[in-house]
A protein has these predicted regions:
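Short, well-formed alpha-helical segments that are part of the catalytic scaffolds
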Residues: 11-26
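Conserved donor NDP-sugar-binding/catalytic core segment of glycosyltransferases
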Residues: 62, 66-117
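A short, conserved alpha-helix in the catalytic core of glycosyltransferases
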Residues: 72, 141-142, 147-156, 160-165, ...
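Short beta-strand-to-loop acidic/aromatic patch adjacent to the donor-nucleotide binding site
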Residues: 52-62
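Active-site-adjacent helix/loop segment of glycosyltransferases
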Residues: 90-95, 99-104, 144, 180-246
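A recurrent flexible, glycine/aromatic-enriched loop bordering the glycosyltransferase active site
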Residues: 116-156
């Protein structure tokens, strides 16, 4: 099975730098002209490659080290039972000791809401929305099964996509569609693994700049839809299970 790397984007001027950073990869870039949101752009592009696995690479990501994508493919081959793999995403920012803050080491649930292992930093103003930020000390260096993973730095097998189909059309714009998609895949019998391949991620750089009051309301409605659909199911619970090396 071949894999297609996809990167939807909004701002033309930033893609040249992205192409330079990931020059060795054959990436499908496509501009979100209609502003349908990143989720529906993922779907639009992956439907253009119906026989390929998909790797979602955001426009605000950068490589952590050389050879990272080959390492991702090794994990994909090593764990055939997993339908989706999430990379370890780091903010391009460090603490005083030089350790990077973790943006996402997999998805979990906190107070009935989707949350990340990590996150909490707002790079635009160095503000925070969590009481404590988590730094990368190697605590996520193992392969772990998680409840869901964010659709960025994410490898999705074609059979996972074929099983779930398109995104639930009742969701709007973006945010929480990826959570719903992951839970739907798990309901269909797939596993989601978090792997210790690091990428830098600014986090929602495009979405933050085009967000307005109407989109904030869409996010709120999406959360309500997600909770109505899944909150009483066994899948709407944090999962953090270490997987043995093969």
């Amino acid at each position: 099975m071949s894999v297609k790397i996809i990167t939807p984007y909004v701002f033309e001027e930033e893609i040249k730098e992205h192409q330079e950073l990931f020059w060795e990869l054959n990436i499908h870039y496509e501009k979100d002209i209609a502003r349908i949101g990143s989720d529906l752009m993922f779907q639009k592009i992956w439907n253009q490659y119906p026989k390929d696995d998909i790797f979602i690479l955001h426009a605000d990501m950068s490589p952590h080290h050389e050879g990272w994508f080959e390492e991702v493919l090794e994990y994909v081959e090593q764990y055939p039972e997993a339908g989706m793999f999430g990379c370890l995403l780091l903010y391009p920012a460090t603490d005083k000791s030089g350790k990077h803050y973790i943006q996402c080491a997999g998805g979990k649930f906190t107070d009935e809401r989707p949350d990340h292992f990590g996150s909490g930093l707002v790079l635009e103003n160095r503000g925070t929305f969590k009481s404590e930020l988590e730094v990368d000390t190697g605590q996520y260096n193992s392969t772990r099964e998680v409840a869901w993973t964010t659709f960025g730095g994410c490898y999705i097998r074609r059979k996972f996509i074929d099983s779930v189909g398109n995104f639930d059309p009742s969701f709007e714009w973006t945010y929480n569609r990826d959570v719903d998609y992951c839970l739907s895949g798990r309901q269909n019998g797939f596993h989601i693994y978090q792997i210790p391949i690091r990428l830098f991620h600014h986090e929602s750089k495009d979405n933050k700049r085009i967000k307005d009051e109407s989109k904030i309301k869409m996010e709120t409605r999406n959360l309500a839809r997600l909770q109505t659909k899944w909150a009483n199911s066994k899948f709407y619970k944090t999962l953090d299970k270490e997987i043995k090396n093969r």
